């Protein structure tokens, strides 16, 4: 079962509607399955066979020409563990997976995340490189990341960044 924030779930449902993958007529059925089986609406979409992960990935890749990343093969490094606050990662359903100098590589599942670019750059002070990944891989990666790093707060990131600056001089 996917672990996805309500806000991200709504955004993804809207992307599916906007791309004519599902219709407004499907929503009552999606909500019914979601409620009855205590699953996310995205899981319900998959269960009802209205769409699959590959279709969602294809839409993102075609719309945005993003490179696809297989998060199941990515090792989580220490610099990735503390690059973004846990609550931000959960709320926005983004998976930071690689820090390469001044570049931060982040996997997204749908185009609703494109509006986060400026915010991500402001938080991390890094150039943001977006990649496409399957919804389930992002969900699993976020869970793995947070089980390894614990609850990363904005305050902890600021402190770590301050310490990094001090050690350089």
Predicted regions and their residues:
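N-terminal, intrinsically disordered, highly charged
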Residues: 1-169
